């Protein structure tokens, strides 16, 4: 009897975890749609629960607060998954920092900028706007910007170590250029407001970085 109970619990546990993860994804997707359509302030937790098709209590149990929900949404959209792995520990970034081809490094950085912004650009815009009135989100935005610059500084330092930076460009100024060209605000202006395609944005970032950082 005891063995059967233990076996059933062991069998059900992964299933319950997957169900919980699926519910979490549904809530995040619903929140993203409503935040993008109506804005952070005008979106209520009951509206998110209704959009996700779950009980309001479920939303609060999963995320605590609306700010906590947006925080979780930002983390997932930035990383592309729900694994708590920093960018600096992700395989694509570690491989980037060990590359010896500066042109490939710059092109990969441009490609990754496109992929990340397509996934997270709108959510980052919402976080930045909400940070004006939400202290917890202001802290989140500061953390995002700090980590973002650190990631780009790693790329600049690698180019510097390869001796590939153009005359007059050091690691600090290279970081400034990477920061400006890859910033979510730049993506938003060009893609969302000016109507650029993702291909055009990626090409422009890559070509501009090559010209400004490598002098080619």
Can you name each region flagged by the protein language model?
Residues 26, 30, 34-68, 72:
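Helix-turn-helix
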Residues 45, 74-81:
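Short, basic, alpha-helical segments at the C-terminal edge of helix-turn-helix-like DNA-binding modules
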Residues 114-128, 135-162, 172-176, 207-214:
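Amphipathic alpha-helical packing segments from all-alpha helical-bundle domains
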Residues 160-208:
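Hydrophobic/aromatic-rich alpha-helical bundle segments in the mid-to-C-terminal region
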Residues 62, 72-73, 155, 204:
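Residues in the recognition helix of alpha-helical DNA-binding motifs
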Residues 66, 72, 83-118, 175:
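Hydrophobic alpha-helical connector segments
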């Amino acid at each position: 009897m005891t063995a059967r109970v233990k076996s059933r619990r062991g069998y059900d546990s992964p299933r319950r975890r997957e169900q919980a993860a699926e519910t979490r994804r549904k809530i995040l997707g619903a929140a993203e749609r409503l935040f993008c359509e109506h804005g952070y302030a005008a979106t209520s937790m009951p509206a998110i629960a209704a959009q996700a098709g779950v009980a309001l209590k479920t939303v609060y149990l999963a995320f605590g607060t609306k700010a906590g929900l947006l925080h979780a949404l930002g983390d997932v959209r930035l990383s592309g998954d729900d694994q708590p792995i920093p960018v600096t520990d992700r395989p694509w970034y570690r491989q980037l920092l060990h590359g010896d081809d500066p042109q490939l490094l710059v092109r990969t950085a441009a490609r990754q900028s496109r992929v990340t912004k397509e996934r997270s650009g709108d959510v980052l815009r919402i976080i930045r706007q909400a940070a004006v009135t939400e202290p917890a989100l202001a802290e989140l935005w500061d953390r995002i910007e700090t980590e973002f610059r650190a990631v780009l500084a790693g790329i600049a330092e690698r180019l510097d170590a390869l001796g590939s930076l153009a005359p007059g460009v050091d690691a600090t100024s290279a970081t400034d250029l990477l920061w400006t060209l890859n910033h979510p605000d730049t993506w938003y202006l060009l893609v969302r407001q000016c109507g650029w395609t993702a291909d055009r944005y990626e090409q422009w970032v890559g070509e501009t970085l090559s010209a400004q950082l490598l002098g080619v």
